[in-house]
UniProtKB/Swiss-Prot annotation:
Belongs to the peptidase S1 family. Kallikrein subfamily. Its EC number is 3.4.21.35. It comes from Mus musculus (Mouse). This is Kallikrein 1-related peptidase b8. It holds the Pfam family Trypsin. Disulfide bonds join 31-173, 50-66, 152-219, 184-198, 209-234. Residues 19-24 form a propeptide.
């Protein structure tokens, strides 16, 4: 199946059909070196397509809409376009998209209003375990939900401009607020469900963007979400982004890793 980057072009005035979804960081800053050691860069045929999170030495979590036929990943990177001694390259032996994600959406040229992107997560089993270092460390799954209003951190190598495709070299971080789900329900034309999180800045100027899909949303130092969808232009005022709510999927994630290790 061909890869389709997911990101919504949304407006409060509404549209007949949104183009394919995409995600990236705008309004952020260069992450401190090795401050996000769980961050993964996911590639398709040498092209960076998504972010991911290292959960265990053999397992990376990303978004289901990042699905392609073959993957490779880089761990321990701070700079996307430079060779680094800390970086580790791994192939992916098998991918496990969540069975509840509607994979047929990835074949569409346009995303229809009301499309349901629930269950947007996927596990990647690495062909060789990651070596744990200062630059490469797994992060644990959440045990409880963060409170609304919590400060969250999203990260990735997605575009740093709202409408043009401009990848940064340095890993980008951006602080966002965890918002009531109604903020996303009122401002997105796709279906918003209770397995999603809503985060952003209602004033605009900061958000995830193209290339950040599958990356982490960390709230109060706890991994709570995986980047799923957001607006174009990125950082549009009044339109937060949506993330897969990981606490809803703890059992599936753990069971899948256990049964396929």
């Amino acid at each position: 199946m061909r890869f389709l980057i997911l990101f919504l072009a949304l407006s409060l005035g509404g549209i007949d059909a949104a183009p394919p979804l995409q995600s990236r960081v705008v309004g952020g800053f260069n992450c401190e070196k090795n401050s996000q050691p769980w961050q993964v860069a996911v590639y398709d045929n040498k092209e960076h397509i998504c972010g991911g999170v290292l959960l265990e030495r053999n397992w990376v979590l990303t978004a289901a809409h990042c699905y392609v036929d073959q993957y490779e990943v880089w761990l321990g990177k701070n700079k996307l376009f430079q060779e680094e001694p800390s970086a580790q390259h791994r192939l992916v032996s098998k991918s496990f998209p969540h069975p509840g994600f509607n994979m047929s959406l990835l074949t569409l040229k346009e995303i229809p209003p009301g499309a349901d992107f629930s269950n947007d997560l996927m596990l990647l089993r690495l062909s060789k375990p990651a070596d744990i270092t200062d630059a490469v460390k797994p992060i644990t799954l959440p045990t409880k939900e963060s409170k609304l209003g919590s400060t969250c951190l999203a990260s990735g190598w997605g575009s740093i401009t709202p409408t043009k495709w401009q990848k940064p070299d340095d890993l980008q971080c951006v602080f966002l607020k965890l918002l009531p789900i109604k903020n996303c329900i009122e401002n997105h034309n796709v279906k918003v469900t209770d397995v999603m999180l809503c985060a952003g800045e209602m004033s605009g100027g900061k958000n995830i963007c193209k290339g950040d899909s599958g990356g982490p949303l960390i709230c109060d130092s706890v991994l709570q979400g995986i980047t799923s969808t957001g607006p174009i232009p990125c950082g549009k005022p009044g339109v937060p982004a949506m993330y897969t709510n990981l606490i809803k999927f703890n059992s599936w994630i753990k069971d899948t890793m256990t049964k396929n290790s």
